[in-house]
Structure formats: C-alpha cells, structure tokens
C-alpha cells in the first residue's frame, strides 16, 4: 500500500492495529503493534508517505481504542510518518469527545472520518453531527476529512448516500 500510495502521489494511507489474542496480556499486543507500525513507519518515511493510524472499537481490538492510546503509540514510535485520526463512531463508542482527540493528539490529529453511528451518512443516525462539526471547526482543524459510509443500507444505492451526505453538509455547514 505504501508503494502504491507513492506511485499514485497519494500523501497518506490509513492503517489500523489489528488485535492481539484476547487471552494474552494487552502489553504483548501493544509491543507487536509498536514494532510492526515502527517498521512500516521507517519504510513510509523513505517513500514520503504518511500513515494515518486509526483507533478501533473495543469489540474489534485490544490495542488502540482511545485517543490516549493513539497518542501513546505515536509517541513511542516517534516517526514523522505516523499521525493519528479519529472516527466519529469509534470515538463515541469509547465515550470520548472531539475535544479529547485534539487535547491528546494536538497537531498529530490529521484525518477525520466524519460519519454518524454505524458508519452512516451524517443525519441518518443519532450522533450530534452538527455539534461535532462545530467543535472540529472551533479547533481550527484544517486537515483532511472523509465520510466512511459503509453501512449495508447503502449497498444498493451508494449514489444516494453521497447525495445525502452533500445535502447534509449544505444544510449544516458553510462548506
């Protein structure tokens, strides 16, 4: 993926941690993750590609779950090629806020998955998406943002999901 990103002149790719065995200490999975992402980071640095490290839900992983986890892992790897991102679904599931991500990651927060609960179109579920948007803007965020819309309800007509996302943005933002 790093080589493909370089070839396509894509500045960044998203990565996540995977998970450790749930019957082993979390520290073991953490160590494996740090070593693996560190190896990828060294290669990504040489290729001029940034790695956007994403947290996952506790139901998916036992490694990176919160913004504090992300900040700690990024600090331990200590590579300019590794930065953090936030997914609204994972953030809310972990009981965190946008302010937590900005406080813990600072300028290392460089990508946002702006989606409603269950990776749905903003406004299709129950997250306070307008509030989230306003908080992001209040922090002066100028990084990248994407809509990770992957709920099965959109499989039949993905174009409608895009249209609904654009409509939500027009109705709720100045973008």
Which residues does each predicted region cover?
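Active-site acidic/histidine proton-transfer and metal-coordination neighborhood
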Residues: 1-83, 93
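Histidine-acidic metal/acid-base catalytic patches
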Residues: 9, 64-86, 91-175
């Amino acid at each position: 993926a790093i080589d493909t990103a370089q070839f396509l002149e894509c500045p960044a790719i998203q990565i996540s941690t995977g998970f450790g065995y749930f019957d082993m200490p979390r520290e073991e999975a953490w160590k494996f993750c740090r070593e693996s992402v560190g190896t990828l980071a060294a290669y990504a640095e040489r290729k001029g590609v940034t790695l956007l490290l994403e947290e996952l839900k506790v139901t998916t992983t036992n490694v990176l779950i919160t913004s504090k986890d992300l900040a700690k892992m990024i600090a331990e790897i200590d590579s300019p090629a590794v930065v953090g991102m936030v997914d609204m679904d994972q953030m809310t599931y972990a009981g965190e806020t946008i302010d937590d991500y900005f406080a813990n990651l600072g300028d290392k927060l460089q990508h946002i998955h702006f989606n409603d609960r269950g990776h749905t179109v903003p406004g299709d579920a129950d997250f306070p998406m307008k509030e989230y948007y306003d908080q992001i803007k209040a922090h002066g965020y100028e990084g990248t943002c994407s809509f990770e819309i992957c709920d099965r309800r959109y499989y039949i007509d993905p174009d409608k999901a895009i249209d609904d996302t654009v409509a939500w943005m027009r109705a709720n933002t100045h973008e």
